[in-house]
């Protein structure tokens, strides 16, 4: 099975991690979260262990910091809930071990995937010709079939940089007509509820931060509990973001995930109004330079390219961009998306 491209919809933002000055506990917590969302728990713990819980003013942050320490410092995995099917629980336990070892750097990613595949291969009936060591792309359809027979829905594939496993029990279908900068996009959205696993990102940060949805060539998927369905966040950071993926899958087949995310985040900036400055702050805080982490890379590119267009040589930053009006920022994002489309359109025509 070709791994499914998953899009993060970030439910919180973490502050930038680079700081030459000593950080207080809130800043240390945010730095830990920023690194954890990139799958680098080893570096995250260097900040998390300096957090003084009593200095955190947010009860939720204290709870999350305690949970992360239990999982990744004390190595105490949370118990599988008693109402979970035992076989599904074994699959989840295998993924949790893989996520933990890979994020902590105690096992290389490739070795972790091989060990995960070997564990899962013992839990399914392999087809003829699968070979003695089938990979995860072979195993995932078999796992999905077995989970569905037990009343679950599942997502596998890759949420860079790790293999993914999300598991939920309820799903209903909705239809939306999404207004994008380059045209309207009618799409189907599967609303998901009653989650058992919110994926590696949710596991890393104790569900303080997790995937809120994704797109496939057929339809969109939304974690219902992540959104107020009447809010701008849902309409912009989910529907518009993921709707752009849907359009780009069709228009630019094979477009790399970092570029898909860049285009979708430009659409967010083009449509956001009340949430626009918060989006700029989030993109600025969470940005990174490596295309190996597509969302942070796209965050940085959006801030960088908006700054080049509007600031005329000044240092890129959300603070500087917020000197411009909502309308100016919306228009600049539309222009950047159009420029990106023009660069890609001839290539798409030739394929």
Outline where the language-model segments fall:
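N-terminal low-structure segments adjacent to metalloprotease catalytic domains
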Residues: 19-153
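Active-site recognition of the HExxH zinc-binding catalytic motif
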Residues: 236-250
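Long, well-structured alpha-helical subdomains associated
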Residues: 273-351
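Post-HEXXH active-site segment of zinc metalloproteases
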Residues: 218, 232-233, 249-266
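Active-site scaffold of zinc-dependent metalloenzymes
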Residues: 161-231
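Positively charged n-region of N-terminal signal peptides that target proteins for export
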Residues: 1-4
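Bacterial N-terminal signal peptides
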Residues: 6-16
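Post-HExxH zinc-binding segment in Zn-dependent metallohydrolases
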Residues: 96-99, 256-291
């Amino acid at each position: 099975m070709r791994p499914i491209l998953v899009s993060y919809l970030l439910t919180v933002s973490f502050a930038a991690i680079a700081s030459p000055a000593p950080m207080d506990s809130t800043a240390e917590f945010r730095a830990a979260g920023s690194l954890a969302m990139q799958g680098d728990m080893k570096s995250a713990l260097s900040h998390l262990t300096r957090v003084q819980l009593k200095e955190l003013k947010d009860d939720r942050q204290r709870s999350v910091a305690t949970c992360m320490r239990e999982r990744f410092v004390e190595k105490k995995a949370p118990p599988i809930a008693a109402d979970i099917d035992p076989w599904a629980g074994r699959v989840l336990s295998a993924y949790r071990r893989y996520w933990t070892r890979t994020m902590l750097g105690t096992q290389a990613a490739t070795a972790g995937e091989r060990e995960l595949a070997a564990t899962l291969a013992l839990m399914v009936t392999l087809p003829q010709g699968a070979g003695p060591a089938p990979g995860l792309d072979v195993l995932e359809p078999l796992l999905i079939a077995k989970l569905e027979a037990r009343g679950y829905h599942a997502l596998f594939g890759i949420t860079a940089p790790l293999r993914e496993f999300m598991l939920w029990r309820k799903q209903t279908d909705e239809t939306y007509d999404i207004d994008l900068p380059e045209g309207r996009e009618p799409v189907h959205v599967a609303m998901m509820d009653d989650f058992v696993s919110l994926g590696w990102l949710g596991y890393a940060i104790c569900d303080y931060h997790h995937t809120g949805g994704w797109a496939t060539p057929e339809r969109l998927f939304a974690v219902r509990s992540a959104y107020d369905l009447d809010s701008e966040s849902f309409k912009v950071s989910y529907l518009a973001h993921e709707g752009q993926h849907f359009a780009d899958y069709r228009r630019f087949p094979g477009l790399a995930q970092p570029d898909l995310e860049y285009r979708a985040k430009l659409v967010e900036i083009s449509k956001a109004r009340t949430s626009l400055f918060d989006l700029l702050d989030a993109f600025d805080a969470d940005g990174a330079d490596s295309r190996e982490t597509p969302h942070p890379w796209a965050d940085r590119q959006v801030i960088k390219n908006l700054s080049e267009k509007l600031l005329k040589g000044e240092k890129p930053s959300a603070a500087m961009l917020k000197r411009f009006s909502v309308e100016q920022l919306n228009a600049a994002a539309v222009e950047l998306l159009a420029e990106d489309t023009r660069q890609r359109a001839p290539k798409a025509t030739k394929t």
